[in-house]
């Protein structure tokens, strides 16, 4: 029985030791969990700041884009103001209006050309639905089928983009 008590006591000591080790391990794991939870909070906070920064960046870019458009329009308006004022002066001094209007017309045309505006050729050209809008057709002896007989309203290209189609009358053989 004495031996049993010793074994029991040893077993109890081992159990006690194992329990202490497990408690120590549990404490370590709890500390590890706390550290990981703190890391998760930090990452979440960082991610939220990044998201807010990105949203602010997007808003700033949209604002900048609107400002660029506004400034581009302002630059064009400033160029057109000279032409506008010249036209106003020509109207006020009608005695030499034809010469004045011709100068204004050339100045206005040159300003638009410098901004990238060009006319779309039409009369005598082959009809192209990407450039021209046919509103009339006519059988005409002087033109081949599909050739533009008359330009009713001029079309324009701004840089490489069509901004106004030419309105035309096209030859259509019967």
UniProtKB/Swiss-Prot annotation:
Domain of life where this protein originates: Archaea
GO CC terms, sorted: cytoplasm
Disulphide connectivity of cysteines: none
UniProt keyword annotations, A-Z: Chaperone, Cytoplasm, Stress response
Record GO terms (molecular function): adenyl-nucleotide exchange factor activity; protein homodimerization activity; protein-folding chaperone binding; unfolded protein binding
Transmembrane residue ranges: none
Compartments (UniProt record): Cytoplasm
Pfam families: GrpE
Gene Ontology BP term (one): protein folding
InterPro entries attached to this UniProt entry: GrpE, GrpE_coiled_coil, GrpE_head
Keyword Cytoplasm: yes
Purpose of the protein: Participates actively in the response to hyperosmotic and heat shock by preventing the aggregation of stress-denatured proteins, in association with DnaK and GrpE. It is the nucleotide exchange factor for DnaK and may function as a thermosensor. Unfolded proteins bind initially to DnaJ; upon interaction with the DnaJ-bound protein, DnaK hydrolyzes its bound ATP, resulting in the formation of a stable complex. GrpE releases ADP from DnaK; ATP binding to DnaK triggers the release of the substrate protein, thus completing the reaction cycle.
Subunit annotation: Homodimer.
PANTHER family: GRPE PROTEIN, GRPE PROTEIN HOMOLOG, MITOCHONDRIAL
Family of the protein in this entry: Belongs to the GrpE family.
Name of the protein this chain belongs to: Protein GrpE
Organism this protein belongs to: Methanothermobacter thermautotrophicus (strain ATCC 29096 / DSM 1053 / JCM 10044 / NBRC 100330 / Delta H)
């Amino acid at each position: 029985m004495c031996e049993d008590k010793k074994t029991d006591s040893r077993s109890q000591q081992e159990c006690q030791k194992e329990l202490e080790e497990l408690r120590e391990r549990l404490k370590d794991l709890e500390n590890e969990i706390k550290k990981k939870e703190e890391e998760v909070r930090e990452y979440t906070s960082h991610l939220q700041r990044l998201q807010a920064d990105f949203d602010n960046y997007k808003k700033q870019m949209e604002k900048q884009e609107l400002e660029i458009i506004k400034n581009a329009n302002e630059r064009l308006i400033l160029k057109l103001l000279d032409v506008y004022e010249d036209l106003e002066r020509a109207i006020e001094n009608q005695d030499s209006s034809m010469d004045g209007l011709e100068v204004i017309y050339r100045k206005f045309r040159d300003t638009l050309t410098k901004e990238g505006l060009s006319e779309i050729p039409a009369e005598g050209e082959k009809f192209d639905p990407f450039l021209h809008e046919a509103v009339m057709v006519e059988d005409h002896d002087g033109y081949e089928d599909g050739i533009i007989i008359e330009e009713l309203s001029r079309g324009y290209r701004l840089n490489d983009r069509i901004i106004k189609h030419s309105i035309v009358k096209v030859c259509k053989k019967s």
